Amino acid sequence: MSTPTPDGWLPTTVQTLLDRAGDDVARLEVALLAAWRPTTLLAHADLPGCVLRWHHQMTKRANSLLVLGPTLPRSTALATSWYARRAPAQAPLAMTRCPLPQGPDRGAVLIMTCDLAQFPAAGQATGAQRPDQPQETPSPAPSPTRAPALWETSPSTTSSPCSSPVSPAPWEAGPRGPGRQGPRLHLGSRLPRVLLERTAARGMGTPDDVARARALLLCAPGQVFATVSQGGEVVGVARLAVTGVNDVAVLDGVWVAPRSRRRGTASHMIRHLAHQARHLGARHLALEVEADNLGAIACYERLGMGLHHAHRYTPLAPWGT
């Protein structure tokens, strides 16, 4: 049994938090936590329904007080003091529930979900787009001989990644010249360097940033990474975290190079990762997206994802107030 620190903080676990979650929103937040689990998770008897997250200031998601209940506790001085001792120059934050925004809201984060049984199959078109949505042409279904093989059934294995040609129709306008290669989708358990570097760049600029980024990206019980490359250059990456919490898999780290956007790249990666999630036993897919990222929201909606709830990062009251 863990011993509390002198100021009363006690290490906690994802399972303990799940056992104490009071509603569907809290349970989904625990699944999101399992997908992006920091090195330090602490609970305090005087802050019921809260968990203090710390990962050396790398991302707000891993360095804020997660409030699982419907409201912020009346006093959060204990958390403010804890963060102030470790990061005095950084304003401590709490992540709290908020009403679903009615439009673009720079401070809100939307949590979107879907039932994987209803998710479009890899390569399946997703229907007409609304005129106000960014035009992203879905990829047609690949031929059976080129479909990617399934990843290993155990998320803890280090299987050999699989590779498949991405359908060239929406991505390769014009004739193919000598030596020109179309984009290829690569799925596997190996962490893409591009994703590691992009995450490490969100640290404090110290030599430990790469190791801390790797710890976050490999923290879930299982991960599947998607990489799209073209001409020897990575033009898209995404991560699927198999959380082991209520059959939820979490999608994050979706990035597409500017020159490859609006060509179906993100949708193609997401469909294939959703297929892997189902194969690994997940029944639900969840993700977080900032409420003012209208292009990403439109892409996820076309794939059948809907709003579940919203949260926002709220500054904690200064210590002593």
Model regions: which residues?
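N-terminal charged segments
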Residues: M1-R86
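A short helix-loop-beta-strand connector motif used in the catalytic cores of GNAT acetyltransferases and
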Residues: R37-A43, A87-Q90, G107-V109, L216-A226, ...
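A conserved beta-turn-beta hairpin within the catalytic core of GNAT-like acetyltransferases
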Residues: M58-S64, V242-L251, R261
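Acyl-donor-binding surface of acyltransferase catalytic domains
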Residues: L68-P138, P142, E152, S164, ...
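Conserved acetyl-CoA-binding loop-helix of GNAT-fold acetyltransferases
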Residues: P73-T80, G253-V256, R262-H275, H279, ...
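Conserved GNAT acetyl-CoA-binding A-motif
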Residues: R86-T96, A277-E288
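Conserved active-site alpha-helix within GNAT-family acetyltransferase domains
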Residues: C98-G107, S267, A291-A310, A317
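A conserved beta-strand-loop-helix scaffold within acyl/acetyltransferase catalytic domains
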Residues: A215-G231, V235-W255
